[in-house]
Amino acid sequence: MFYSKKFKTFKNINHCFFSRKGGFSKGIYNSLNCGLSSEDSKTNVLNNLNLVSKKMNISSKKLMLMYQTHSSKVIVINKKNKNLKKFQSDAIITKMKGYALAVVTADCVPIIFYDIKNKIIGCAHAGWKGALNGIIENTLNEFKKLNANNRIYASVGPCIGKRSYEVNLDFY
């Protein structure tokens, strides 16, 4: 588990970035695969999600997941939609206490957001396509719709590096 030094100083938020190690999955999904849409055994994925929930000290019923589509779509989780548990988007945010927001990445960039004054949390899956199409800007705009101020903190998690990621020239 990895932590943001800055986020560790905030009293009202618990956060971490998990590595791929320490779970139940085997083979190409070894070992902490939390991707419900993967072809991994659903039992392994659910066991991994339960492990994450325990480490975060919350009920697995309070772990909010996304079906990530490399889009720029952001969903605000509220009392009306909280029971969906899995949202088709690449960012989720909420003001509700007692919930954990999750983003699953391999190469893409996980980002955690926090408005310390208004107690708004969010997380985003920023792949190159979503980043180019505004996932970060859209996430911040949704924060502002919830009356966030300009003191939104962000922590960027582990992701693929430039030396390990090839793109065609037309990408630039």
Can you annotate each of these PLM segments?
Residues 1-172:
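Active-site microenvironment for binding and transforming phosphate-containing groups
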